[in-house]
Amino acid sequence: MKIFNLIFIFLLVVIVIYSGYYLSRSNENLIVTIPYGSTTKEIAKVLLENKLISNESIFVNISKITGFSKKLQSGTYKFNRRSGTLKILLMLWKGKTFSLKVTVPEGYTAEQIAELLQEKKLCDKEKFMKLVDKNRLEGYLFPDTYFFSPGISEQEIIDRMTAEFGRQYLSEFNNKAKELRLTKNDVVSLASIVEKEAKIEEERKLIARVFLNRLKKGWHLESCATIRYALKNSGKPLTYKDLKVKSPYNTYRNYGLPPGPICNPGLLSIKAVLYPADSDNMFFFTKNGGTHQFSKYYDEHIKKQR
C-alpha cells in the first residue's frame, strides 16, 4: 500500500510539473472549438495548433494518468494561454464550454434578431433570413435570453428559438384559439400587432379586445404597426400616403389579419389575444406616445383626440 501511495504521489508531482511545463507569457484568452467525437490525440492536436500546449504526447499521457481521457467533452471553450495542461484538462473534463449571452427583446422582427446575432458574430444575417423566410418563421422566434456557443449554425439558433416557442405555447392555447375561431397563426399574427401597439403591459388585453371586436364586425384593423412593417419603418412618423401603400400587410386597405406576424411577440401578448379584456371598445389612439385612450363609438374617439 505504501508503494502504491508513493507511486501515486510521484505521478501527481509529474502531472503538476508537466501541467505547468508550457505557460505562455501572454495572458490572452483564446476561443477554441473541440469538434464532436474528437479523440484525446485529436484534442491535443487542436490545442497544440493553438499553442496552448507544447507537446501532444505529454497531454495525452497526463489525460490517461488522470483518467480524463475517456471523459473529455467537445464544444467551444475559452482558454487562457497561461492555463497549463492540467487546468485545460479539468475544463474539458467538466465541459466548461464558453457561450455568449444574447437577449432577444419582445417585439423584435426576424431581421432585427439577425442583425443582433450578426453583431455578436454568431450568424450571417443573409443566411439566417433565408432560413426564416423559407420556413415562414417570423413570429415563432421566441424572445428570451439565450446562451449560444461561437460556431453555432444559423439553423441551430433557429431551432433553439422555435423550440422555446413550442415550450411556451401551451396545448391549452390551441383549445382557447378554437373558441375564438382563430388558428395558431392568427393568434401569433394578432399577438405580434398587440406587441407593437402596446406601450404598457396593462393595455395589452384592451388592445387585443379592440382588434378582436373589429375582426368580428368585419372592420379594417387599421394598425399603424402593420404599415411600419410593410414599409420597414421603425420610427419615422407615418403619412396619409403611407396608409395607402399597396401591401398585404396594410390593414388600412385589407380586411382581416395580415398574412403573418409582423414581429416575434412575447408570452404576455399571446395571452392577451387568447384572454382579452371584456370590452365593447372599437377604437383607441395613443396619447403623447404613451398610454392609449379607448372608445366604443367613433364620435367619442374623435372627441377624445381634440
Predicted regions and their residues:
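Signal peptide-directed extracytoplasmic domains
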Residues: 15, 25-172
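Intrinsically disordered, low-complexity segments enriched in polar/charged residues with Gly/Pro
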Residues: 8, 18-21, 63-66, 89, ...
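N-terminal start-of-chain detector that recognizes signal peptides
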Residues: 3-7, 50-51, 74-76, 118-119, ...
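Short non-domain terminal segments
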Residues: 2, 6-8, 77, 247, ...
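Bacterial extracytoplasmic/cell-wall-associated proteins, especially those involved in peptidoglycan
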Residues: 114-125, 132-306
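N-terminal type II signal-anchor transmembrane helix
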Residues: 2-30
